[in-house]
Design a protein with these regions (language model features):
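Catalytic active-site module of serine/aspartate enzymes centered on a nucleophile-bearing elbow/loop
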Residues: 298-313
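Active-site machinery of serine-nucleophile hydrolases
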Residues: 91, 95-158, 261-284
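Solvent-exposed loop/turn segments at secondary-structure junctions
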Residues: 97-101, 131-136, 173-177, 198-202, ...
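A domain-start/cap signature at the N-terminus of enzymes
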Residues: 20-91, 141, 170-194, 198-200, ...
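Alpha/beta-hydrolase fold nucleophile elbow
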Residues: 161-173
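Bacterial N-terminal signal peptides that target proteins for export
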Residues: 1-8
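The feature captures the conserved acid-bearing segment of alpha/beta-hydrolase catalytic domains
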Residues: 191-282, 286-289
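Bacterial N-terminal signal peptides
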Residues: 8-18
Length: 313
């Protein structure tokens, strides 16, 4: 895997291994950093929700229903075995893809993130909401999924020991599309979002609040469904999902984004951004998938990089 740090401007130096190192020069493309509150600093002290210290009662792992925006909605919540009511923990929303469901998220360990949480003994509450309340996996013409997300988040904060400064969202395909949509509207609630093959069309998009948010994204160079570029004229495609957050996080001159040309994927982190609000993009030669492995590796690097990204905070 090639992991690049893109600096604007930069002086590149090639090592004998062919890895691009760089020395940073003053960056005229970066905005003056806004003040960052304590809850957004890296490795900040957890911010406990109102549910911290409360007994779980009958609110336990499993399938739940609630009424939201006039619709009966369902979700599955997974409260970890090492949950401690007095210690606020991370909360991760996993949004399913077309053809999938909330149960799919449970079956695939919430895009593999639960496997890493258990391995590292990190208590994480996982939530898999159910879409399919209209003709699409997630709603394309109104904000009812956004209201559903807000209602769930409010409920979980009231019932559970949630670290309100470490709420995350991830998804693949249509799940990435709704995750991206939420990333434009819930920057004050979401610490970071991970999108695997996102698209910024055929989905409800709110007016972007243009607030900073940590963002990780992947797109295959041969993806014909959620294309890296669907339309330059309309700024549609995974490329523009990345560029939107680069700009919202502080860069005024948008960079060229390196794309993979060999079977080994290329991950780029864009410099000139506050460390609290990184933007990272993983490119690979391949199609529409959330599972990708480099030659000779049995590790799904998308899941691994997502976990590492979320754990920065």
């Amino acid at each position: 895997m090639k992991h690049r740090h893109l600096l604007i401007p930069l002086i590149a130096v090639m090592t004998c291994c062919g890895v691009c190192l760089a020395q940073e020069s003053p960056d005229p493309a970066a905005k003056a950093p806004a003040s960052i509150d304590a809850a957004s600093k890296l490795k900040n002290t957890p911010v406990p929700s109102a549910g911290t210290g409360k007994e779980l009662g009958d609110f336990k792992s499993g399938k739940h229903t609630m009424t939201s925006a006039g619709l009966e909605r369902e979700y599955i919540i997974d409260i970890p075995e090492n949950y401690d009511k007095d210690k606020p923990c991370r909360l991760v929303f996993a949004m399913h893809m077309m053809g999938g469901s909330m149960q799919t998220m449970v079956d695939n360990k919430f895009y593999g993130l639960k496997t890493y949480a258990e391995k590292d003994k990190i208590p994480v509450i996982f939530v898999a909401p159910q879409g399919y309340t209209d003709s699409s996996p997630w709603r394309g013409r109104d904000d009812k999924d956004h209201i559903f997300f807000a209602d769930m988040l409010k409920l979980f904060k009231e019932k559970l020991a949630v670290d309100t400064s470490r709420v995350f969202c991830c998804g693949f395909s249509f799940g990435a599309m709704v995750s991206y949509s939420l990333s434009l509207d819930f920057q004050d609630d979401l610490r970071a979002v991970a999108c695997y093959a996102p698209a910024n069309w055929n989905i409800y998009l709110p007016e972007n609040k243009h607030k900073p948010l940590a963002f990780y994204s992947t797109t295959g160079t041969e993806d014909g469904l959620c294309k890296y570029v669907n339309s330059d004229a309309r700024k549609e495609g995974g490329k523009y999902c990345v560029l939107t957050h680069i700009e919202d996080n502080g860069l005024t001159e948008l960079p060229e984004i390196p794309l993979a040309t060999t079977p080994t994927h290329v991950t780029t982190e864009f410099k000139g951004l506050p460390e609290e609000y990184p933007v990272v993009f993983g490119s690979f030669v391949g199609g529409h998938t959330d599972t990708a492995k480099d030659p000779g590796s049995d590790v799904n690097w998308i899941s691994k990089e997502t976990w590492d990204f979320f754990m920065r905070f």
